[in-house]
């Protein structure tokens, strides 16, 4: 299994240490073991390679943008099973990651993973986003929902000059969503991701 992870990371030119491979391997195995109990991911994707490619690698496609902007802290909203927050934290260990998840089941899983993977740069926040009072330079979200559903509330959690990085799919759908929220932000940028996964993946950067 570790060889599969190494191949996938190398194919996308990600830099990694052997300990990163070990953590990803353990993380995926824990998801497979506990998915039914914690309702972490879709059952149709509940095999090792699907989790590796559709979730782990996809999450890592945003890492270069985080490093380019270089915030001191990152808030990951609706972390679920930990994508992208846990993955980014593994490969970006010098930065603090806050993972906000309202579901008690999923936040319990995240707390278990944080301890087992020894992720000292991760803090789990278990409550509704409306209760968050802190302001952040950088917010990530990886959700299938329309950006119009969460753009305003996330904007209100941004520091001046901060940005939201949303993982999104097809470009034509993104254009429709961007038109609904373009007046909320000073700048909106769409970055096409160089994915080998044969799926259309983009990042939408929403600047306050």
Curated annotation (Swiss-Prot):
An example of a GO molecular function for this protein is:
rRNA (guanine-N7-)-methyltransferase activity
Binding positions (S-adenosyl-L-methionine): 78, 83, 101-103, 129-130, 142
Record localization:
Cytoplasm
Specify the superkingdom. Answer: Bacteria
Question: Which keywords does the record carry?
Answer: Cytoplasm, Methyltransferase, rRNA processing, S-adenosyl-L-methionine, Transferase
- Looking at its record, which EC class is this enzyme? transferase
Task: Using the UniProt record, give the first listed, main subcellular location.
Answer: cytoplasm
Key word ATP-binding present: no
UniProt GO cellular component terms = cytosol
Q: What is its EC number?
A: 2.1.1.-
- What's this chain's function? Specifically methylates the N7 position of a guanine in 16S rRNA.
The entry assigns this protein to a family as follows: Belongs to the methyltransferase superfamily. RNA methyltransferase RsmG family.
Name listed for the protein in its UniProt record: Ribosomal RNA small subunit methyltransferase G
